[in-house]
């Protein structure tokens, strides 16, 4: 497969390096000149428990890129989706497609820019971190799913899957890509909650006193999905049915235990959200990932007060008015406690 990967960080870099190693014709684009320069000079190095190798892959900044591609993988942070989609548009062939390998419901934004017929959905849940220019940690395997946003199973998504099998042999095609994306939104709300602290994902999810909070967050997101007519899909220990009000009383606990086990197997101990806040000291994807859910929920008369409060607390950490600590997670849990007592 000949493809352009727009965003060569944790997700795009890991995918691009593996595809290059398997013989695919990959070109990378990234906004960080120091990252591009390191890749040009030394190659893109993948490290971690799963694979350690260096891929020689051409890399460019957006302003130096020339050419046109039939397949472009968009792997930027969610809040950069619109600007990235507009920047890549001159490089997309008339019959080409853009695949969103991101967190969130970014296919909606991409479709607005490039057209729905040129937009392909993808769901990736593997663990990776950008460590330094030219170096990516591939910390843990996770689900890899591709699908048309209208639910059809087409030759192009089958071709993408065949290529992505060279990255992960478990890659699949789905007729319900929105189900995976909304499922990740529910799990993602839990990850944002863990990032209010300095605990690892696994340690935070294992804490008994916060489990009712995690369940309530997932329930809010899944209620909005249901209001949109979406049936959420499960992955890597996350079982959406376990968080429904009609689920057996121990179902959510079992799912959380499986999520803890999944995350303990990964060398990536903390979420990208935590890393944005604690290490890179930059804005997170919270508005593009969770803020949009609050807005969709309000429009559907399906309120999400816990999710809205979580967005506020992440903003507090971003602007320096709160610290990442269990006290901040307690501030979110207090709202849930007030709701339960109402």
What residue spans do the PLM features occupy?
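NAD(P)+-binding Rossmann beta1-loop-alpha1 motif at the extreme N-terminus of oxidoreductases
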Residues: 1-51
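Rossmann-like NAD(P)(H) cofactor-binding subdomain of soluble oxidoreductases
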Residues: 29, 53-135
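Rossmann-fold dinucleotide-binding core
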Residues: 67, 101-190, 195-199
């Amino acid at each position: 497969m000949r493809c352009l990967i727009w965003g060569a960080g944790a997700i795009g870099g890991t995918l691009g390096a593996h595809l290059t190693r398997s013989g695919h014709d990959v070109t990378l684009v990234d906004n960080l000149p120091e990252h591009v320069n390191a890749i040009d000079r030394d190659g893109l190095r993948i490290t971690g428990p799963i694979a350690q190798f260096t891929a020689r892959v051409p890399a460019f900044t957006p302003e130096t890129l020339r050419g046109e591609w039939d397949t472009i993988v968009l792997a930027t942070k969610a809040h950069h989706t619109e600007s990235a989609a507009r920047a890549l548009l001159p490089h997309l062939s008339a019959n080409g497609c853009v695949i969103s390998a991101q967190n969130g419901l970014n296919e909606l934004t991409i479709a607005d820019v490039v057209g729905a017929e040129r937009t392909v959905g993808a769901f990736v849940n593997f663990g990776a971190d950008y460590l330094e220019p030219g170096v990516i940690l591939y910390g843990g395997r996770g689900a890899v799913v591709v699908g048309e946003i209208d639910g059809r199973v087409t030759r192009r998504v089958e071709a993408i899957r065949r290529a992505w099998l060279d990255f992960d042999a478990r890659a699949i095609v789905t007729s319900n890509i929105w189900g995976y994306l909304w499922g990740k939104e529910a799990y993602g709300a839990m990850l944002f909650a863990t990032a209010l602290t300095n605990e690892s994902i696994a340690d935070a999810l294992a804490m008994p006193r916060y489990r009712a909070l995690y369940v309530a967050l997932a329930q809010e997101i899944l209620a909005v999905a249901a209001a949109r007519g979406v049936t959420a899909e499960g992955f890597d220990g996350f079982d959406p049915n376990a968080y429904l009000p009609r689920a057996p009383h121990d179902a959510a606990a079992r799912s959380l235990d499986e999520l803890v086990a999944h995350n303990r197997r990964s060398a990536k101990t903390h979420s990208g959200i935590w890393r944005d806040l604690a290490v890179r000291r930059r804005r997170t994807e919270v508005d593009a990932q969770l803020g949009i859910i609050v807005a969709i929920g309000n429009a559907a008369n399906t309120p999400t007060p816990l999710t809205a409060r979580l967005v506020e607390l992440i903003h507090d950490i971003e602007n320096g008015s709160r610290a990442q600590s269990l006290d901040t997670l307690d501030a979110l849990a207090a709202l849930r406690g007030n709701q339960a007592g109402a």
